[in-house]
């Protein structure tokens, strides 16, 4: 492997390695919630995902003739995120393929640490969702006892997305929704835990609030002004204020929206790097996400939206840099002309 590239990756690891360490450990509370809802199977799935990601890291280090270092937890954090985006009933081989796709195709093919244009966790999830939709987008109800190794006989459904798509409102109280007591990917339903994790990442300066806030605000505004619930779009805002707000609540708490806002959107190498660029980036992901949710076939369309906007995040950065230079060059030129 090129020595200059190795040195550059080591510099990047010094700069952003703490982000992946924090994400890795903050996935543990969500895993605990998943085990509370579904038993020991989420622990088995996450363990297999971690093992797969770690073995990929060691294999790539061997093939590229570099020394493996356990300081880099990016593969492990991507693997955990992919596992938490899956239903607790997913077959083990599907999860393994998703992790392999995310780590090898989403990350290593582009050069490894810090060189990838697309979020590797979103790549892994998208590959699994497109290849095995009947396993990836259908979920068991919480508190359903799951066999440890083979959960194929457990009843699963997509009732949450079916309800929202048909114009209905979730028949759940706010506390149940905040705690994640509904059929969803095993690590994405506990909103209170996810928000607490996001607060920790923010206080540790691992993430910038601009992208996440603009993403959630954009999604909320679209859900408020263009609701999917039957009859709300034709009614006035004031007469349907509470149902619209309930629709916003349902949209933001389902489809892994909060989870992606905290754990995927601010990934250091795929998110825009400047303040205004991050706000625009989050807004674009929000628009694309609601488009996928309203007109697509996957409940977790946010992962596909993220991949779509990842393709222009570098363009957003370059455009902002050019505008910044242009706006600061004009006053200096006028000053020189006046002198």
Residue ranges and their predicted role:
Residues 1-61, 333-339:
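N-terminal signal-anchor module of multipass membrane proteins
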Residues 1-22, 292-339:
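Cytosolic-side transmembrane-helix boundaries in multi-pass membrane proteins
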Residues 7, 55-67, 103-114, 196-205, ...:
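C-terminal ends of transmembrane helices
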Residues 117-121, 249-257, 278, 296-309:
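Loop-to-transmembrane alpha-helix initiation sites
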Residues 115-195:
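Long hydrophobic alpha-helical segments that form multi-pass transmembrane helix bundles
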Residues 71-151:
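Membrane-interface helix-loop-helix junctions at boundaries between adjacent transmembrane segments
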Residues 22-29, 45-57, 74-79, 83, ...:
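Alpha-helical transmembrane segments in multi-pass membrane proteins
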Residues 39-51, 89-98, 181-191, 243-257:
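Structural signature of hydrophobic alpha-helical transmembrane segments
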């Amino acid at each position: 492997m090129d020595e200059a590239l190795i040195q550059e990756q080591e510099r990047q690891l010094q700069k952003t390695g703490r982000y992946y360490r924090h994400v890795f450990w903050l996935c543990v509370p969500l895993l605990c919630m998943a085990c509370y809802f579904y038993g020991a199977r989420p622990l088995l799935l996450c363990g297999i995902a971690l093992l797969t990601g770690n073995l990929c890291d060691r294999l790539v280090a061997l093939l590229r003739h570099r020394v493996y270092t356990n300081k880099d937890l990016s593969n492990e954090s991507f693997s955990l995120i992919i596992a938490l985006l899956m239903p607790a009933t997913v077959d083990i081989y599907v999860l393994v393929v998703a992790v392999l796709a995310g780590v090898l195709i989403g990350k290593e093919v582009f050069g490894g640490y810090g060189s990838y244009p697309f979020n590797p966790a979103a790549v892994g999830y998208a590959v699994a969702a497109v290849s095995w939709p009947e396993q990836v987008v259908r979920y068991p109800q919480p508190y359903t006892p799951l066999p440890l190794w083979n959960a194929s006989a457990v009843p699963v459904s997509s009732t949450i997305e079916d309800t929202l798509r048909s114009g209905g409102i979730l028949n759940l109280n706010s506390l149940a929704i905040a705690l994640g007591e509904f059929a969803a990917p095993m690590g994405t339903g506990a909103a209170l835990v996810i928000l607490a994790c996001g607060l920790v990442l923010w206080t540790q300066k691992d993430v910038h609030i601009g992208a996440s806030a603009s993403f959630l605000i954009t999604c909320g505004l679209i859900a408020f002004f263009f609701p999917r619930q039957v009859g709300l779009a034709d009614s006035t805002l004031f007469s349907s204020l509470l149902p619209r707000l309930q629709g916003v609540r349902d949209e933001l708490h389902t489809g892994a929206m909060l989870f992606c806002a905290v754990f995927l959107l601010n990934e250091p190498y795929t998110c825009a790097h400047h303040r205004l660029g991050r706000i625009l980036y989050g807004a674009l992901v929000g628009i694309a996400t609601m488009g996928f949710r309203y007109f697509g076939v996957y409940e977790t369309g946010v992962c596909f939206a993220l991949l779509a906007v990842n393709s222009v995040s570098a363009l957003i950065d370059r455009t902002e840099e050019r505008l910044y230079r242009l706006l600061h060059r004009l006053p200096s030129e006028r000053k020189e002309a006046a002198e």
